[in-house]
Amino acid sequence: SPEAMRRTLDEMAHTTLLQLFKEKPEARALFDKSAGYAVFDSRKVAFILAAGFGRGVAVDRSTQQKTYMKMASVGVGITFGVGNFDNKIVILIQEQADFDTFISNTQDARMDGKAILGDSKEEASGSFVDGRKYYVLTRKGWAVTASVTGVNYLRDDYLN
């Protein structure tokens, strides 16, 4: 049911944020400065053509209004590794206007994905890049980047 799915997504988002703050304490300062955030549970299938899908929830920090969302990605190459596996994505969004755009069915075209494979200079900076910060929980732990892969984020009409 939609209610059960919303509860599951809310619990996943809460648990993922707690894990992020415990394992990457510096993320808390950016979270506190953000206008909103989104947490997705995604499954990646990555061989030559990488594809991914998932669901999540975006939260406006000023109102606590939740928007349930779907995500889908397609790219060429091995972006997240070989095989079929899950990961969690936390997106911190700095400005309210950017958050509002994000929850209004958006395609994130700023992607490069390289930082997901290892540490990056962006991780050390502790700041937003182009108004966002992405934390990706992979099998190896948290990776930090300014972007993920070419991803469509869409409002989930079934859950909203």
Which positions does each model-derived feature cover?
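Small-residue-enriched, tightly packed secondary-structure blocks
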Residues: 1-160
